[in-house]
């Protein structure tokens, strides 16, 4: 691969920072972008710009011609890539849960029970429970709310809701009408 920038051109452009930077950027930006992309940097374009912003003030101080310049540019690019990966490992990117992107193939026990039982059977099973237990299971399983949401609705703590749900499920497991649906 031939460089568009030669040692002679680099020497001739010393002192004219605008043209020198333009030539350096045109010569190396694509290579730096490719390097950062290959290394898995999440936003390689932004990091490429950061690399050249770090290189610009040091252009007059670089020795070794085009080879020394290339070494310096890729040293900066490597350091920025390492910094970016460290930053990502310390503060991972969070995404909201999107049910359409959920690729799990195993459904939950609650979902399987709902498929097996007709709505009237579910209501009959819930009659075995106390009012609070029935309300918790209805909100958690039928309405699909989180523990925190159920606690807020019922005016109880998260722990109380979890305990009510646990006791309700134990009560249901002990009834013969439920035993045919529940595997040991």
Which residues are covered by each model-predicted region?
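N-terminal module of bacterial RNA polymerase sigma factors
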Residues: 1-30
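Internal acidic/polar
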Residues: 2, 83, 91-119
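Short, small-hydrophobic-rich alpha-helical interface motif
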Residues: 13-14, 28, 32, 44-55, ...
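Short, charged helix-capping/linker segments at alpha-helix termini
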Residues: 14-22, 33-50, 64, 158, ...
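Σ70-family region 2.3-2.4 aromatic/basic alpha-helix that recognizes the −10 promoter
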Residues: 29, 49-56, 66-87
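Arg/Lys-rich amphipathic alpha helix in sigma70-family domain 2
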Residues: 38, 60-64, 75-96, 115
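DNA-recognition helix of helix-turn-helix
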Residues: 78, 82, 142, 148, ...
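A short pre-motif secondary-structure segment
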Residues: 136-140
């Amino acid at each position: 691969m031939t460089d568009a920038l030669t040692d002679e051109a680099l020497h001739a452009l010393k002192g004219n920072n605008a043209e020198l930077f333009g030539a350096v950027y045109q010569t190396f930006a694509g290579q730096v972008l490719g390097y950062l992309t290959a290394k898995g940097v999440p936003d390689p374009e932004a990091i490429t710009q950061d690399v050249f912003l770090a290189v610009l003030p040091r252009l007059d101080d670089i020795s070794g011609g085009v080879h020394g310049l290339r070494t310096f540019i890729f040293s900066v690019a490597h350091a920025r890539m390492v910094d970016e990966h460290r930053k990502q490992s310390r503060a991972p990117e969070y995404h909201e849960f999107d049910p359409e992107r959920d690729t799990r193939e195993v459904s939950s026990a609650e979902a399987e029970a709902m498929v097996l039982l007709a709505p009237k059977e579910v209501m009959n099973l819930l009659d075995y429970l106390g009012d609070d237990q029935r309300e918790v299971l209805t909100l958690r399983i039928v309405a699909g709310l989180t523990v925190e949401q159920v606690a807020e609705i019922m005016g109880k703590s998260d722990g109380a809701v979890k305990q009510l749900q646990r006791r309700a499920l134990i009560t249901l497991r002990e009834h013969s009408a439920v035993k045919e649906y529940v595997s040991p």
